[in-house]
Structure formats: C-alpha cells, structure tokens
Design a protein with these regions (language model features):
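Right-handed beta-helix
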Residues: 1, 56, 60-63, 71-157
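A positional/architectural concept
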Residues: 11-16, 23, 34-36, 46
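Short boundary/loop segments of OB/S1/cold-shock single-stranded nucleic-acid-binding domains
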Residues: 1-14, 87
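Non-cytosolic beta-sheet module surface loops
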Residues: 20-22, 69-71
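Short aromatic-glycine-enriched beta-strand elements
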Residues: 25-30
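Conserved hydrophobic positions within beta-strands
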Residues: 17-20, 79
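Beta-strand/loop nucleic-acid-binding surfaces
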Residues: 38-57
C-alpha cells in the first residue's frame, strides 16, 4: 500500500520541458527527462484569470515548467508555471519591482518604492505604444518645468 501511495505522489507533481504549444487551444505538451522523454498529452496552462478578466500567457517551447497531474493517471494534467534555473536566471533581484521581460529584450518594470513605471524597447528598431479608445492624461511639464507637450499632443523640441 505504501509503495502505491509513493508511486501516485511521485507522479502528481512533475518538472518537464515544453515540447510544443498549441496557440489556438491554449495548451502545451511537455517532455519529461526522468521518463525517457515521454511526452504528455495536451495540457491546459494555469492563468491568473479566465472569466471576465482574461490573462493570456503560454510557455515557449523548450521552457522548463512545473506540472500537476490528477491522481487518476497522466492523461489529465495542468502546467502550473515556469521555473527559473541555472540556465534561465532571474531577470532582476529587487523586492520592490514587478518586471516583465520579453524575448526581444523589451521590458516593463514598475518600482513600487519609487513609483516609477519604465517601458524600455531594447529592440534595435525601437517600439510603438498603441492606446486605443482611451482618454490619455499626462503631466504637461518636465522635471525642468518646461512644457513637454503642445495641446495637439506633439512632442516639443
């Protein structure tokens, strides 16, 4: 009986590498090195919201993920999230920051201590910010006290 319980528990939580992603269904397949590269069925990916508020995130192929399987077997499981590792290190180490870094180097960073939101397009061609269907409010002076924007919202030079 104890061996059966150990076997079930050992198969409930597993670490693997994403082998493929179905961007239409929002699922991914995961290969498990400890099982001779056995590949899972399509697994749902845990997200922060899926009802009224919706959060879209899918892991990349070759990303290390943590998976949870139902105790009825390995036919139904879920990807709980990604893991940092020796190869994939933390992008920052600051308890006051929320940080999102994208594959092209672009990042969004909020520092709750300094109340600073930073958006940095590290891509050689720069980037675009698109705001649709919104009224934008902004401070009309720079730190130097000079006008930053004209009423037409064109940057002053």
């Amino acid at each position: 009986m104890l061996k059966l319980i150990q076997s079930i528990v050992k198969n409930l939580i597993r670490v693997g590498i994403v082998s493929s992603v179905d961007y239409q269904k929002g699922t991914a397949k995961v290969a498990f090195e400890d099982r001779d590269q056995v590949v899972s069925y399509d697994m749902d990916v845990l997200v922060k919201n899926s009802f009224r508020n919706k959060d879209y995130w899918l892991p990349d192929p070759e990303e290390q993920v943590l998976c949870l399987f139902l105790p009825i077997g390995n036919g139904q499981g879920f990807i709980l999230g990604s893991l940092y590792s020796i190869d994939d290190k933390l992008p920052i180490k600051n308890k006051n920051k929320r940080h999102v870094r994208f594959g092209d180097g672009t990042f969004i960073d909020y520092d709750r201590e300094t109340h600073t939101l930073t958006i940095d397009f590290l891509h050689p061609e720069g980037g675009h910010i698109v705001i649709n269907n919104a009224k934008v409010t902004y401070n009309e002076t720079t730190q130097r006290g000079e006008p930053e924007w004209r009423s037409s919202e064109v940057l002053e030079t």
